[in-house]
């Protein structure tokens, strides 16, 4: 089978600049922070090529849809943020592109944060063509996030994120305040590269929400991403909120599943799972109400139980939202499972998870 993947074409986009817009070319941190204090809609800050060591970037302002404020590299890929470095974005209509994080780690709990502070969240902002390469804490048991997404209407696209070796979710959509809920974020066309097995919870590659916000809608779209051997834990993507769209993603030899852990009304469609016979590779795990799972392709998966090619969980009677809500009113249709070890219905059945789902099948077109 040949998969034609067009995920990593560089995003070429034009940013219109008014005659009054300022171009700041900066060669050190003092010059950067002086420019960052002055930027207005349409302005561009360009970092000079080279290694920027121990650089904690804050980037906030008031751009517009037509005139975003941009932080970029002199040449994409040639601005290296090393040592103890990170990036915090606030304001609105801000764009960051072309930076590389490697040979270091964040001194805080996040490398890239879509908030400058608890009161300055990013909105309508974008991080694109950025690399985070093995930028892990030295102590593998010290947790952090590599990307924390807050605010609303933000986009993370065409980035390379690989090699996390310490505890903590690689990418988390945070719903901690109303200002970050029903956010309509987009996470698309990214490469999520190998992550070693953590051996405990907290090793997801992507988590949308947490159990504290299980009844909250996130309205986040995750599409056209490539998950390459992301083996952190059994949940590669953990959707813990409602009304999310997970579409057109590829999971290549990744141990674990796309899991609808909490939240109702999610859509999972047109994803491809290729296991190539690797142990513990799985597909989709379904929990909660009103989920739609359609037109997905699963081949060569060897996981079973919670990591089967398709897993339908048993529920807890009258379950609170943060436990195991029974699968109800789910639509699971037009999915293909090829050369895979297991499809599991009633997974996790025990004295607590005692509610099985009722299955209804539609007639095959050949039977009509």
Predicted segments with their positions:
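Beta-solenoid repeat scaffold
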Residues: 39-80, 87-98, 120-125
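Sec-dependent signal peptide recognition
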Residues: 2-8
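Glycine- and acidic/polar-rich repeat regions and solenoidal domains
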Residues: 56-57, 83-90, 102-125, 132-362, ...
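Cleavable N-terminal signal peptides
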Residues: 8-9, 19
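Residues at the C-termini of beta-strands that transition into short coil/loop
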Residues: 30, 72-75, 85, 105
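Right-handed parallel beta-helix/beta-solenoid
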Residues: 19-34, 49-51, 74-75
């Amino acid at each position: 089978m040949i998969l034609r993947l067009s995920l990593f074409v560089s995003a070429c986009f034009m940013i219109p600049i008014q005659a009054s817009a300022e171009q700041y070319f900066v060669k050190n941190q003092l010059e950067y922070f002086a420019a960052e204090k002055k930027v207005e809609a349409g302005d561009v800050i360009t970092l000079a090529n080279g290694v920027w060591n121990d650089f904690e970037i804050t980037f906030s302002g008031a751009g517009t849809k037509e005139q975003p404020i941009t932080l970029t590299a002199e040449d994409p890929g040639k601005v290296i943020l090393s040592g103890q470095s990170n990036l915090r974005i606030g304001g609105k209509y801000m764009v960051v592109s072309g930076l590389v994080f490697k040979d270091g780690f964040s001194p805080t709990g996040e490398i890239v944060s879509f908030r400058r502070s608890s009161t300055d969240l990013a909105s309508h902002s974008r991080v694109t063509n950025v690399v985070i390469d093995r930028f892990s804490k030295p102590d593998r048991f010290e947790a952090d996030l590599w990307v924390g997404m807050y605010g609303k209407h933000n986009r993370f696209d065409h980035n390379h994120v690989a090699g996390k070796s310490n505890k903590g979710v690689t990418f988390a959509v945070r719903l901690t305040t109303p200002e970050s809920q029903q956010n309509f974020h987009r996470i698309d066309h990214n490469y999520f590269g190998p992550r070693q097995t953590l051996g405990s919870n907290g090793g997801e590659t992507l988590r949308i929400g947490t159990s504290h916000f299980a009844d909250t809608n996130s309205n986040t779209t995750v599409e056209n991403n490539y998950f390459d051997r992301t083996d952190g834990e059994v949940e590669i993507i953990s959707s813990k909120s409602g009304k999310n769209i997970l579409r057109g993603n590829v999971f290549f030899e990744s141990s674990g599943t796309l899991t609808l852990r909490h939240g109702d009304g999610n859509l999972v469609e047109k994803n491809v799972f290729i296991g190539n016979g690797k142990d513990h590779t799985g597909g989709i795990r379904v929990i909660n109400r009103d989920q739609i799972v359609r037109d997905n392709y699963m081949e060569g998966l060897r996981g079973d139980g919670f990591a089967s090619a398709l897993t339908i969980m048993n529920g807890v009677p009258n379950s609170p939202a943060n436990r195991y809500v029974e699968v109800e009113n789910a639509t699971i249709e037009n999915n293909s499972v090829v050369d895979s070890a297991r499809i599991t219905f009633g997974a996790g059945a025990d004295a607590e998870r005692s509610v099985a789902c009722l299955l209804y099948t539609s007639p095959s077109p050949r039977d009509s």
